[in-house]
Design a protein with these regions (language model features):
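Flexible loop and strand-edge segments within Gram-negative outer membrane beta-barrel domains
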Residues: 188-317, 355-359, 434-437, 619-622, ...
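Outer membrane beta-barrel strand-and-loop segments of large Gram-negative receptors
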Residues: 315-319, 361-363, 444-446, 450, ...
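Periplasmic plug
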Residues: 86-131
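Outer-membrane beta-barrel translocator/receptor signature
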Residues: 134-138, 146-194, 215-218
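Surface-exposed extracellular loop regions of Gram-negative outer-membrane beta-barrel proteins
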Residues: 136-137, 141-154, 243, 248, 386, 407-455, 476-494, 616-629, ...
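Short, acidic, small-residue-rich periplasmic hinge/interaction motif at the N-terminus
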Residues: 28-68, 89, 130-132, 142-144
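N-terminal periplasmic accessory domains that precede
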Residues: 43, 75-78, 91-93, 113, ...
Length: 673
């Protein structure tokens, strides 16, 4: 016989966790959506609700239930409830993988503004796809309306210290089309203080740096989805954003006159994406095109006690990507092939040279299954790379294999995989000319730099135990000819790109996702602990200000939420990262934590959120540069990130039902896309 925990006891436990007294009565929410099967992916997982069928361990589907997710939550917030995802400063990554996963909405790249405005209630399911032809991806599938429907939401945010934001998501849906418009605006003021301690000729010098920056950002996104038949779907996305900043920094030094640097500038980005997929039987053909252009303009004005200087920097970058993919089945084999062409061109006032990059990639893959439980995934990525500057041309061929073997049981799954990847230097890195990143600091490129190669061997295991989803991974990573910037010992303000050395890393990752109290409380924890060794190349050991060495590292995220029957939701979110060891420095971070309370009104149309951001006061980083194990430079940065945020979300919509004669209206008017 199951034991029932009284709600008063549940609330007492939550009050001890949050330091807040709660009250409410039990109630189970409902949903009006159905999930239709998709032959592309096998295995369905449900967050904290029903039995999880792990299926293919590196291709999983999670259906997001409304229980535990705050009313008015957006898609980026919903991703924090997905098992096995880690959130970092660069974006989301899948547990046991070092690369940043690409986030998609219905197969098309998603911008941060679109993720922040897409309602979580519009999500049908979340697909976590690791490895394979397209790398790590997180694909958010939206619900599609079977009737005509107009809906939207407006988000307003106010934070202290000064930060104001506004965004909207307006969607018009029909059975064959979806039109979405997402405008957003942001204004903020940020203060960062830094303390630099540097040794020169055995004498220590101090330098205090204070930066104040005002940011104005505006963007708009238009997305059009068209489904002429159940076999053919198309997506067109256009986005424009402008990010302007205006700020100044003041520096006080022990041995040099104080100085003030005024900086103004803006960045404009224009992107377009087109995707089309046609499916017949067990096969489908997918075509994708991506066009992007970026303008960057910076104006610097330096004032010291002895002189004044002004500089203006401009850069223009264009990207063009085309991809086609064909997939089909033959017995136990699922064969796929894809071709991609990527062209990138950059012009910059930093350098008189124009940079061009052209990459042709042909990928051949095979997914094979042996019975119901055993399977494998094999991929060969053949690439031709051409990089051009006005003074040099680099050409190279690459053959990059990927392979995995997996076993999937009723409640558990295990996988062993191997991957070889190559990181290419950009135009800024191979450009041998020198350009200044500030009035005093400058960087030199390296025309003879080699590509960085990374070998990864991983063992992963997942298991479902009642309402708890466990995932673990052990990874071994070996990087050769690592690309990085090194500081010259004779001139610490000069940074030079080089193949600085090689590294070896071992990491053990653990993920826990569990629900309690009839799914009103949800815990999602992901963490990684490892040990890394950095070996400086012999030619840099005596001439560079480098750290190298070895040591442990750790990182992780925690999302703990509790929802009462009266639609109060309490959330604790934490993100931490331990010592970061690179070839040139060691860096320590303070953790970032915030507490949030959410309440919905007016039949869930209005949602209010109150957040306490980072009560420790600052996001602090402590960076140290060494030479022969003796610290030469220490840079401590304090980003004043504590504060309070008040958010308001208003949702609205209207459904237009259409029928002929005495045709009955089905109770379910929505289905998965």
């Amino acid at each position: 016989m199951k034991k029932h925990i009284p709600e008063a006891t549940q609330l007492l436990i939550v009050a001890l966790l949050f330091g807040i007294r709660l009250s409410g009565a039990a109630q189970q929410p409902t949903t009006d959506s159905i999930a239709t099967p998709d032959n592309e992916l096998e295995g369905v997982s449900v967050i904290g609700y029903r039995k999880i069928n792990t299926g293919n361990i590196h291709k999983q589907i999670f259906e997001l239930e409304a229980k535990g997710v705050p009313k008015g939550a957006s898609a980026d917030r919903a991703l924090r409830y997905v098992p096995g995802l880690l959130m970092g400063s660069a974006g989301y990554s899948i547990l046991g993988s070092e690369q940043v996963a690409q986030v998609l909405i219905d197969g098309a790249p998603a911008s941060p503004e679109e993720l922040a405005s897409l309602p979580a209630q519009s999500i049908w399911r979340i697909e976590v796809l690791r490895g394979g032809v397209d790398g790590d991806r997180i694909n958010i599938r939206r619900l599609r309306s079977l009737t005509r429907e107009f809906k939207g939401r407006i988000d307003l945010g106010l934070s202290q210290p000064a930060r104001y934001s506004a965004s909207a998501n307006l969607t018009l849906q029909t059975p064959t089309t979806v039109l979405t418009f997402v405008p957003s605006a942001l204004w903020s003021r940020q203060e960062i203080s830094s303390q630099l301690d540097r040794k020169s000729a055995g004498v220590a010098h101090g330098w205090h740096h204070q930066t104040t920056t005002k940011t104005k950002q505006a963007s708009s996104l238009l997305r059009f989805d068209f489904f002429p038949s159940k076999h053919w779907d198309n997506t067109l996305v256009a986005m424009y954003s402008r990010n302007g900043h205006d700020g100044f920094s003041e520096s006080t030094q022990d041995v040099l006159p104080s100085q003030r640097l005024d900086e103004t500038g803006y960045m404009q980005i224009l992107q377009g994406h087109l995707a089309s997929r046609y499916k017949w039987g067990e096969s489908f053909l997918r075509l994708r095109g991506h066009l992007a252009s970026e303008w960057d303009r910076q104006e610097l004005s330096l004032q010291t006690a002895t002189h004044e200087a002004e500089n203006t920097y401009r850069s223009l970058t264009g990207d063009l990507t085309y991809q086609t993919k064909l997939e089909g089945r033959a017995g136990r084999h699922k064969l796929n092939t894809s071709y991609a062409l990527t062209h990138r061109e950059t012009r910059s006032s930093y350098s008189p040279q124009r940079y061009k990059s052209l990459i042709h990639a042909l990928k051949l893959g095979d997914e094979v299954s042996w019975g119901e439980q055993w399977g494998g995934d094999f991929l060969l990525d053949m690439q031709y790379d051409e990089q051009r500057l006005s003074t040099l041309t680099r050409r190279a061929w690459y053959f990059l294999p990927y392979a995995s073997l997996y076993y999937s049981g009723a409640r558990d799954a295990v996988e062993l995989s191997y991957d070889l990847s190559v990181s290419r230097p950009t135009g800024e890195i191979v450009d041998p000319t020198r350009y200044y990143t500030s009035d005093t600091e400058y960087t030199e490129g390296n025309a003879s730099i080699a590509n960085e190669r990374t070998h990864t061997l991983a063992l992963r295991y997942q298991r479902q135990v009642k309402q708890t989803f466990l995932s673990t991974a052990f990874t071994y990573t070996r990087t050769l000819d690592a690309i990085g910037r090194i500081h010259a010992l004779a001139d610490p303000q000069l940074e030079t790109w080089a193949n600085v050395g090689r590294s070896t890393a071992y990491a053990l990752s653990l993920g826990v996702n569990s629900s309690f109290f009839k799914h009103k409380m949800n815990l999602n924890l992901g963490t990684a602990l490892g040990y890394v060794t950095k070996e400086i190349a012999p030619e840099h050991r005596l001439t560079a200000l480098s750290a190298g060495g070895s040591g442990p590292f750790y990182r992780g995220t925690l999302n703990l939420s509790y929802t009462t029957s009266r639609d109060w939701t309490y959330t604790i979110y934490a993100q931490w990262s331990g010592r970061e060891l690179t070839f040139s420095y060691q860096r320590d971070h303070l953790p970032y934590v915030y507490f949030e309370v959410n309440k919905s009104f007016l039949d869930d149309r209005l949602s209010l959120t109150l957040s306490l951001l980072n009560p420790w006061g600052t996001m602090r980083t402590d960076t140290r540069y060494f030479f022969r194990d003796v610290m030469q430079t220490r840079w401590v940065t304090n980003n004043h990130s504590s504060g309070v945020r008040l958010g308001l979300t208003y949702s609205f919509g209207k459904r237009f039902r259409t029928r002929q004669g005495n045709e009955t209206i089905e109770q379910t008017d929505r289905k998965g896309k």
